[in-house]
Regions:
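Nucleotidyltransferase catalytic core that binds NTPs
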Residues: 2-236, 245-247, 278
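Phosphate/ribose-recognition catalytic cores of enzymes acting on nucleotide-derived substrates
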Residues: 226-286
Length: 286
């Protein structure tokens, strides 16, 4: 497995692979990899001849008061996980490798980004779309892999690929959870012992809504109210949003008629965590 920093080095490797008619999978990450990321790499390895993992804490998707400087970084640890999973190349650029001093071109979207995380992080998805678009141009993968935990990001990237005619398939992969139900996240490392326990309120509230839906409840307002009451009972938790939206348009829904995304964002202490369930009721699964 190789680790490279420049666009030219990545393209040189890709060129060699393409000469051999090998398929290429891309797993874009911000590093500090965990079992959730490993599940993406595992799937990419299973479905492609060669796999590139990008490890880049993208400054463009962080707001001015967010955790860019404190976001955890450990390339040695990331490389060990990637190698064990069977990745072939890590692309680990410095910011100046991705954004020149006079960089001024961005990918923005008028739909899908105004609600959910976009409501309180107004420049976030412009940064996400721009860096992912650049990675798609640099690597030119056959398939790119994203986790369902960042459900809005997954929907946005799929829409961008369709709008801009990127010649690749976006593959969404299931959320990977800790044994007690907490969705795996690099930001879980911010939590102290008490906060880690409090964070279980996210999956607990979503599971309660899931049970209600399975029992026949279809009113989004009732479900939302019950989720909020569970979260508000946890002293360390503060709700950013609780929403039920159409999974294709991300527009709010009043009735649960799949496919519907139930997405939540909650502050546990100072740490903002997200989680979700997706309901595909017409297909009879999630």
């Amino acid at each position: 497995m190789k680790i490279v920093q420049t666009v030219e080095e990545v393209r040189a490797e890709i060129k060699k692979w393409r000469r051999e008619n090998l398929t290429v999978g891309l797993v874009p990450t911000m590093g500090y990899l965990h079992e959730g990321h490993k599940s993406l790499i595992d799937r990419a390895v299973a479905e492609n001849d060669r796999v590139v993992v990008s490890v880049f804490v993208n400054p463009m998707q962080f707001g001015p008061s967010e955790d860019l400087e404190s976001y955890p970084r450990d390339l040695e640890r990331d490389a060990a996980l990637c190698e064990e999973a069977g990745a072939n190349l890590i692309f680990h650029p410095e910011p100046e490798n991705m954004y020149s001093s006079d960089f001024s071109s961005f990918i923005d979207m008028n739909t899908l980004t105004g609600g959910l995380c976009g409501k309180t992080r107004p420049t976030h998805f412009r940064g996400v779309c721009t860096v992912v678009g650049k990675l798609f141009h640099i690597v030119e993968p056959d398939k790119a892999y994203f986790g369902q935990k960042d459900a809005q990001q997954l929907a946005v990237i799929r829409h961008m690929v369709k709008d801009l005619n990127f010649n690749l398939e976006v593959v969404g992969c299931p959320i990977i959870r800790e044994e007690d139900g907490l969705a795996k996240s690099s930001r879980n490392t911010y939590l102290n012992k008490e906060e880690r326990q409090a964070a279980l309120v996210l999956s607990r509230s979503l599971d309660a809504a899931k049970a209600q839906i399975e029992a026949g409840e279809r009113n989004a307002a009732i479900l939302k109210k019950n989720i909020c009451s569970i979260i508000e009972a946890e002293p360390l938790a503060r709700i950013d949003y609780v929403e039920f939206v159409d999974w294709n348009t991300l527009e709010p829904v009043e009735t649960i008629e799949g496919p519907v995304l139930n997405a939540i964002a909650v502050y546990i202490g100072k740490t903002r965590l997200i989680d979700n369930h997706i309901y595909f009721e017409k297909e009879g699964n999630q």
